[in-house]
Swiss-Prot record:
It is found in: Cytoplasm. The lineage of its organism: Bacteria, Bacillati, Bacillota, Bacilli, Lactobacillales. Monomer. Binds 30S ribosomal subunits, but not 50S ribosomal subunits or 70S ribosomes. This is Ribosome-binding factor A. NCBIfam families: rbfA. SUPFAM superfamilies: Ribosome-binding factor A, RbfA. Transmembrane segments: none annotated. Pfam families: RBFA. The gene is rbfA. Belongs to the RbfA family. One of its GO terms (molecular function) is ribosomal small subunit binding.
Amino acid sequence: MARQYRSDRLSQEIEKEVSDILRRRVRDPRVEGVTITGVDVTGDLQQAKIYYSILSDKASDDQKTKAGLEKASGLIRKELGSRLSIYKTPELSFIRDESVQYGDKIDQLLNKLNRD
């Protein structure tokens, strides 16, 4: 129970800090407009999956954003290490959150049904 509580709190802290780091420290234009939607940290606190969304639906924009995030992951991890008081900073992996596009698609279908 305590271990789960700690990983949940760390997930929330990482989400907040990564959003701030992307907004203030990362200068790469490929990661502009990225929104961090969630973070999952493993029970041993060694790995963190960071879920993000972007406004564009284009595959090329997704690839550019993913490449920008992967390139900036070293800086992000270093900044996290200095901001968080934990023994070892988790390894970061970035995964696109598809739920935003799915929700948008559902919304469009509902609007279409209401018009008909």
